[in-house]
Design a protein with these regions (language model features):
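Alpha-helical membrane-inserting segments
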Residues: 17, 21, 25, 43, ...
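Interfacial aromatic-anchored transmembrane helix boundaries in multi-pass membrane proteins
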Residues: 22-33, 58-93
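Hydrophobic transmembrane alpha-helices
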Residues: 1-53
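Short helix-perturbing small/polar motifs within transmembrane alpha-helices
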Residues: 13, 20, 77-125
């Protein structure tokens, strides 16, 4: 069991890593390929459900209060951006990954991979409806799914693979 101070430091570290991951990006229309999903997976895997979700909540809150840590800055204006739901989705994503890590009984690689896939589904379950409604229904649901999800899945699969490989080496060691 980790000390509360160690948990707080690791939580702050993963909030910072998620912020850094926002700037390691390839712009693509309304969104970008970033490393935020990777760091959210790692937060859930290594910190567990509560501290992992807290790290992502801190990241989102710091961006909303104006720190320029989102891909296009920060501030309350992000509520109106089509991609804001994906930022919110990082919180339940980390929580679900951490919870599954506690309860699944597979070998570490498989447990991490499955947990991250389910967490990614949660991210898209929050992000896609927000994306659709923020665009005012101007896009069809099909175009929203393609542009807000399907084009990112190969890259997300790669991030989950790397998180599973790295996480299986680090799990239980932090």
């Amino acid at each position: 069991m980790r000390s509360p101070l160690r948990n707080m430091l690791l939580t702050a570290l993963f909030a910072a890593l998620t912020a850094v991951g926002a700037f390691l990006r390839i712009p693509l229309g309304y969104s970008s390929f970033t490393l935020q999903v990777f760091f959210t997976c790692m937060a859930g895997v290594l910190l567990g459900p509560y501290w992992g979700a807290t790290s992502q909540a801190i990241y989102v809150l710091l961006g909303l209060v104006g720190l320029p840590i989102f891909t296009e800055g920060g501030g309350l204006m992000y509520f109106a951006k089509p991609t804001f739901g994906f930022l919110l989705g990082l919180i339940p994503m980390a929580f679900i990954i951490g919870m599954l890590m506690k309860h699944l009984r597979f070998k570490p690689f498989a447990r991490i991979a499955l947990s991250c896939v389910v967490g990614l589904v949660a991210l898209y379950a929050v992000g896609l409806p927000c994306f659709y409604f923020a665009l005012g229904g101007a896009w069809s649901i099909g175009k929203t799914i393609v542009s807000g999800c399907l084009i990112f899945l190969p890259y997300d699969a790669l991030k989950i693979l790397v998180a599973s490989l790295l996480g299986s080496k680090l799990y239980g060691r932090l």
